């Protein structure tokens, strides 16, 4: 059974209609540690940027122009449809949610890795379309059995020559 299908089985038990997996970590970094590569684990897409939306019967990956060719190759045969960001004929994630989330649908995600801006946008769409949001669900914890640990390297201060002043 594919990781996507395992994930769908878990989601069904929680009555979640749509689950969003972004590419970021707790700090909204573009390049993340292995622990935060849930989108890659489920979809097989290895690009640094992309957002995965999973429903019981469909799955979509939003990727930008840097990754169109790579995503097409890596998603082939997965059942995940590529949504080409900033390309005519492809809705944004928010447009897709507004057009496809029916009244009383449930959209879930791990709120620790979603940007505040995207959360507020989805919240507004949810209010307009009368669907609910569950932001404290990390289904990856359950389905990714051998998930790498969170990084434990010590933090350090970069010298001003590298970090600049603000």
Residue spans for each PLM region:
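N-terminal accessory/capping or targeting/presequence segment of soluble
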Residues: 1-102, 114-166
